[in-house]
Amino acid sequence: MSNSTYAKFISKKLGGAPPLVDLNSELKTGKFILDCYHNGLINAAHDISDGGMLVALTEMMLAGNNGAEIIHPEGADPHCWFFGENQSSYIIATTKLKEIIKRSENANIPLSYLGRSSSAQELKISNGDIISLKELRNIYETGLTKQLSQ
């Protein structure tokens, strides 16, 4: 995370070379996502390369005006899990989870269950944290302005 958006704004420093890009993995994963989309299996998708999972999920929630309930894996470092800008990684929204799982296994694409969308206007994390969609929108829309004014 030494060259991530998180590192830039939180620790105020960047360090080291960025990780090497695995172009084969990028292509394979991208083709998988497109194939699922073209076959009507994905309602929405967002890569996590700019800000990490939590930023991508927030953007999806704001665009769809939906909430979400997500599972924070036990033992996972919250900073890395929420803000790690992993390559070849996407958040997808689907109502056809079993078919996505089957296709990911056949294509040898790793898949993790993050949670589910919700009609509640909030992000609920399994560790007990809850933030309203209104507050997320405010943070998202004014965050850069606040950072630049400091």
Regions found by a protein language model. Give the residues of each.
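Short, acidic (Asp/Glu-rich) active-site segment that either coordinates a divalent metal cofactor
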Residues: 1-18
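Glycine-/charge-enriched secondary-structure boundary and capping motifs
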Residues: 15-18, 28-30, 34-150
